[in-house]
């Protein structure tokens, strides 16, 4: 299966081969707290797929979990919007920050991924504008380093923010105080050993990928 189903695409109340998606995301958050700890006052998730991982981080670290974002239910997922401009505008329309929840606090922001960096820098800025004194970003998946050829809109490597950048450089680009990713070795653990495709993280695909990009340019 595509590990992105458990991380992002699937509903939290669904199961994949008997393994609950909600449980997998909670576990990812726990692993993040173990492997990438930081002192803070509040853990928040970027809705919706970041919420369970944020709860897991809170349970493992003992840092309180809270709600920082109000989501506009009429806006779809920004990751699968067809163009860069539509992704950027959707972020601003999709989320509002609860200022009273984050003002004066050191915030850990949990999200499911950083692909192009379109949403992360804007959400970090929203938290700072709302009064957060620090914003520490934790991602419940490894860095995206390779494209997907099998159905997910993960573009050529040059469009991926992690391509040819260190974690510190990505942290600077998105404007966070610190940045941590889930380790690649944790992916199998979070889904209890189910066979998974993690080619977008490792470059190792379950079948030989095409030698050229056959997806075309859908952003024109």
Where would I find each of the regions flagged by the language model?
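PRPP-associated nucleotide enzymes
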Residues: 4-220
